[in-house]
Amino acid sequence: MIKLVLLRHGESQWNRENRFTGWHDIDLTDQGRIEASNAGKLLRAEGFTFDIAYTSVLKRAIRTLWHVLDEMDLMWLPVTKSWRLNERHYGALQGLNKAETAQKYGEEQVLVWRRSYDTPPPALEKSDARYPGSQARYASLSEAEVPLTECLKDTVARFLPLWHETIAPEIRKGRNVIIAAHGNSIRALVKYLDNVSEDDIVGINIPTGIPLVYELDDDLKPIRSYYLGDQDALKKAQEAVAKQGKA
């Protein structure tokens, strides 16, 4: 049986401040580092091991993976970093407080921006300091590949080439894979693997620092999926994510 592990990064500073983060490269809090280390300890205790790891080019995911691999004594593991695993780009909302944005635009509108499948937030201007196109880490991307905003549909389209061309072939070779990424890039893969409808994806919330395990058949179709660890703590963490966009 094939097991794939997905892990959203530990709590970041902007998670704590309840801000839209997107492609902004904010670091983990002390709590986020603890969450990441605990995830590594839990994976080791449950008998997991890995042959290759994937993460984004944002430090909160990279550092989370470091902590996990350190706890598992797998720091030597090959790691592929890809912009395709970045968080969804939140456009002009990046940096804004979610509750304050809900007060201004209404909770319903913010829910649409945060969780709907095909409605992006207002776009950035290319002249905006938050536009990622001028950053060295994205120098190899075409102008069309650098987003000004994204909906989840855009994130799925961005991520799937990496899945089909790189990650899935490694899994088919029998390699054990961990992906340390972000709430919406993981939601993108969950939607694809589980064939979640556009309506139902609104209700899927990925908590920070809790490993999500997929058991897959030989065609990489899910047999089942489950989170490791305390299930009461998981439920509270998912509820906390869902409440972030309330006024």
Curated annotation (Swiss-Prot):
Disulfide cross-links: none
Top-rank taxon: Bacteria
Marked site (Transition state stabilizer) residue numbers: H182
Keywords: Gluconeogenesis, Glycolysis, Isomerase
Catalytic site positions: H9 (tele-phosphohistidine intermediate), E87 (proton donor/acceptor)
Gene3D superfamilies reported in the protein's UniProt record: Phosphoglycerate mutase-like
Enzyme class: isomerase
A Pfam entry, by short name: His_Phos_1
EC number: 5.4.2.11
Annotated GO biological process: gluconeogenesis; glycolytic process
Residues the entry annotates as binding substrate: 8-15, 21-22, 60, 87-90, 98, 114-115, 183-184
GO molecular function, one term: phosphoglycerate mutase activity
Pathway recorded for this protein: Carbohydrate degradation; glycolysis; pyruvate from D-glyceraldehyde 3-phosphate: step 3/5
The reaction(s) this protein catalyses: (2R)-2-phosphoglycerate = (2R)-3-phosphoglycerate
Listed HAMAP family: PGAM_GpmA (MF_01039)
Known function: Catalyzes the interconversion of 2-phosphoglycerate and 3-phosphoglycerate.
Cross-referenced NCBIfam families: pgm_1 (TIGR01258), PRK14115.1 (NF010713)
Family assignment from sequence similarity: Belongs to the phosphoglycerate mutase family. BPG-dependent PGAM subfamily.
Protein name: 2,3-bisphosphoglycerate-dependent phosphoglycerate mutase
Organism: Chlorobium chlorochromatii (strain CaD3)
Taxonomic lineage of the native organism: Bacteria, Pseudomonadati, Chlorobiota, Chlorobiia, Chlorobiales
The encoding gene: gpmA
